[in-house]
Design a protein with these regions (language model features):
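Conserved short alpha-helical segments that host acidic/polar catalytic motifs at enzyme active sites
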Residues: 1-177
Length: 177
């Protein structure tokens, strides 16, 4: 969760219903990321659970659905420029890649567009910064992203069922392109 000057990341392994153990309903913030995942490419380990922090940037985090085929090449390129990684997970590469783009003067929107050019594979990801949140999808929109929006909130998920508890009569559901 972010309130514009800090971000808190909670990681755990277990069912989403255990999230309430962390009293997230009491958090204050303008935006947040949450993620449940079925590990397909990396081991089931709390270090590999989402969201991923873009080290050493304390205000950038990413959640990702998909697989990057060029994450090792991108990781090596970023490591040569001094970045360090905590895992071998492809999602962490996205976080550091975007942080690097922002550090080099691109806006969040420009960084997201650049990621579509540079990341190879099938993916949809959400990224949170101190003052905003954004998303990117691969060119073929292989991985789904559903948005639920009304006057009170905007929520995104890779499956519509994850949004059902938030939907009211004035909520609009759509899949962005």
């Amino acid at each position: 969760f972010s309130i514009g000057n800090s971000m808190e990341i909670i990681k755990d392994i277990g069912p989403a219903v255990e999230l309430e153990d962390y009293k997230v309903a009491e958090f204050e913030g303008s935006h947040g990321l949450a993620h449940t995942r079925l590990a397909t490419e990396s081991r089931v380990d709390i270090c590999y659970s989402h969201p991923f922090w873009a080290r050493p940037f304390p205000d950038i985090a990413v959640v990702h659905n998909g697989q990057l085929t060029n994450h090792n090449k991108l990781r090596r390129s970023l490591q040569r420029r001094g970045y360090e990684f905590s895992t071998t997970n492809d999602s962490e590469v996205i976080a550091v890649f975007i942080a690097d783009q922002l550090l080099n003067g691109l806006t969040l929107e420009e960084s997201l567009i650049e990621s579509i050019e540079q990341l190879d594979g099938t993916f949809t990801y959400l990224i949170s910064t101190t003052d905003g949140i954004g998303f990117a999808k691969d060119r073929f929109s292989t991985k789904p992203l559903i948005v639920a929006e009304n006057k009170s909130f905007v929520a995104m998920a890779s499956e519509e069922v994850a949004l059902h508890s938030m939907i009211s009569e004035d909520t609009v559901l759509y899949e962005p392109t």
